[in-house]
Amino acid sequence: MKIVLTPNPYRDRNFKHVEQAVSILQQSGVETKICLPFDVDRNFELPGDMNFCDLNKEIKNADILICFGGDGTILHASKIATRYHVPILKLFFDECFI
């Protein structure tokens, strides 16, 4: 099984939620790929220790997409996921949760 995770880097700046999900899924033997659902601003620094994959490439053979963020994040990710009929699980985090 392959799961693609798409975090919103502006909401979860240190990616702690997606890293927790990756850890749990990989312990269960699931292949995971972290992909950004949209391009980030030029001045925004992404963590150098994380490997971000191309969503357009990874979604093609994914079993599910887990989207971390709000409505805008899921709209970006769903544009690509629906082309390949990949189901989407949305996990919403409001400001007080992060």
Locate the predicted segments by residue.
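ATP/NTP phosphate-donor binding region
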Residues: 1-64
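Small-residue-rich beta-alpha loop regions that form the catalytic core of phosphotransfer
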Residues: 10-13, 40, 50-98
